[in-house]
């Protein structure tokens, strides 16, 4: 006789990552009013919103190419922004970069990582929130500073729906 095998119950930890349709939903889930970048390089739009362990809000922006994709190397490249109240590096990027520099941006100490002129990673703490921003395609330090200077507490987040 053939004996039917019982499917083994799922064993292990539930995923620490939760996807959300909007930044507002993720912020409510975390019970945080996250500071968000109001300025990004032209062409970047929200691709996804998620939380990690209810500690870190992650917003991934992706470059949407215009008419001529052959002329823009940023096509498909992402900017990963994370914010939370946990201490330490929350960027998720632990690569060693040639240059690490610390500068003040509007009175806030910011650590930049990358090359002499180009930035791949920026991290800072402001108003009790810890921030990390990773650029798949590096930006110059002035662009990174402009993004950081304009990462502020929201009055209302821009709607994003999947």
Residue ranges and their predicted role:
Residues 127-162:
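Surface-exposed amphipathic alpha-helical segments
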Residues 1-5:
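Sec-dependent N-terminal signal peptides of Gram-positive bacterial secreted proteins and lipoproteins
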Residues 8-126:
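Short, solvent-exposed recognition patches
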């Amino acid at each position: 006789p053939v004996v039917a095998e019982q499917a083994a119950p799922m064993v292990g930890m539930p995923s620490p990552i939760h996807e959300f349709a909007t930044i507002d939903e993720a912020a409510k889930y975390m019970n945080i009013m996250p500071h968000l970048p109001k300025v990004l390089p032209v062409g970047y739009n929200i691709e996804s919103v998620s939380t990690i362990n209810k500690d870190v809000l992650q917003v991934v922006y992706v470059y949407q190419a215009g008419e001529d994709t052959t002329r823009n190397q940023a096509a498909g490249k992402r900017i990963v922004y994370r914010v939370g109240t946990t201490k330490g590096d929350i960027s998720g990027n632990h690569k060693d970069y040639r240059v690490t520099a610390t500068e003040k941006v509007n009175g806030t100490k910011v650590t930049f990582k990358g090359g002499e002129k180009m930035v791949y990673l920026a991290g800072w703490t402001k108003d009790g929130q810890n921030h990390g921003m990773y650029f798949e395609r590096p930006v110059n330090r002035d662009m990174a500073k402009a993004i950081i200077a304009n990462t502020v507490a929201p009055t209302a987040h821009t709607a994003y729906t999947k």
